[in-house]
């Protein structure tokens, strides 16, 4: 278990950016374990990226526990944050405590992430902190509320909505969240929130002035050739690399070139 106060220290504001990557499986987690990346998020975005659903809503707590266990095996020394999925904490404080407790006990993760900034969510964050469960907040485009937003749209564009987001960010910080993800909001709002809250902000489509950034590993590696939101920079083109490798394998099997003597007993 990594030291939360070392990795997510507010003293890093303006000094050292935090790098976070979202991962769902053992093989990629093992690679991440060999890198200097600061933290791994096991996101309920696995519902879309890994399962092929149109949203994160179908993901269950059991599925999140399974994937978080797998990622922990691959990256035993990384600071791992696990999403609590839709309806695993919104129905009551008691349900939120049970879900967060299960996640921590059964996966050996270091923290949980929950979406929203309502009074209910802030109360849950405060209680979880009191019982020893670190919580990362999530504001802006919160995918579990995608139907309320009318799709995956930039949030906080108007004066009223930006003021509301800022109030919620301050409330989350004061309730005990150790960090807040800001997703798909104007860069200027991302800067303002980062300046006004006392904890580190982690942006995804929230501009360069957040205290850190998070991207889904599959996305930054370019595994999906058709996925290109404005906030995404692809640092590789694994779609073409994987496709070329599979086509080469297919051709060598057909021709009889593989397996050769080097691959035979």
From Swiss-Prot:
Alphabetical list of InterPro entries matching this protein: Pantoate_hydroxy_MeTrfase, Pyrv/PenolPyrv_kinase-like_dom, Pyrv_kinase-like_dom_sf
Intracellular or extracellular location(s): Cytoplasm
GO molecular function per UniProt: 3-methyl-2-oxobutanoate hydroxymethyltransferase activity; magnesium ion binding
Needed co-factor(s): Mg(2+)
Catalytic activity: 3-methyl-2-oxobutanoate + (6R)-5,10-methylene-5,6,7,8-tetrahydrofolate + H2O = 2-dehydropantoate + (6S)-5,6,7,8-tetrahydrofolate
GO annotation, biological process: pantothenate biosynthetic process
A cellular component annotation (GO) from this entry: cytoplasm
Family the UniProt entry places it in: Belongs to the PanB family.
Protein name (record): 3-methyl-2-oxobutanoate hydroxymethyltransferase
């Amino acid at each position: 278990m990594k030291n939360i106060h070392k990795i997510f220290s507010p003293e890093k504001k303006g000094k050292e950016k935090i790098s976070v990557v979202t991962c769902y499986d053992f093989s990629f987690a093992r690679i991440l374990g060999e890198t200097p990346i600061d933290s791994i998020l096991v996101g309920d975005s696995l519902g879309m990226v890994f399962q092929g659903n149109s949203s994160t809503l179908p993901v269950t707590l059991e599925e999140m526990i399974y994937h978080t266990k797998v990622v922990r095996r691959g990256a035993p020394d990384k600071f791992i944050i696990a999403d609590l999925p839709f309806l695993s904490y919104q129905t009551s404080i008691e349900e939120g405590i049970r879900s967060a407790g299960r996640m921590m006990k059964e996966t050996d993760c270091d923290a949980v992430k929950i979406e929203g900034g309502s009074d209910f969510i802030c109360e849950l964050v405060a209680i979880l902190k009191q019982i020893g469960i670190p919580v990362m907040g999530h504001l802006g485009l919160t995918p579990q509320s995608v139907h309320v937003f009318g799709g995956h749209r930039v949030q906080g564009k108007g004066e009223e909505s930006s003021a509301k987001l800022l109030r919620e960010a301050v409330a989350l910080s004061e309730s005990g969240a150790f960090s807040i993800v800001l997703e798909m909001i104007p860069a200027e709002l991302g800067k303002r929130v980062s300046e006004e809250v006392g904890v580190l902000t982690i942006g995804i489509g929230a501009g360069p002035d957040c205290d850190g950034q998070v991207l889904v590993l599959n996305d930054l590696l370019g595994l999906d050739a058709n996925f290109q939101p404005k906030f995404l920079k692809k640092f590789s083109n694994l779609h073409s690399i994987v496709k070329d490798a599979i086509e080469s394998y297919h051709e060598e099997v057909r021709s009889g070139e593989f397996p050769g003597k080097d691959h035979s007993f």
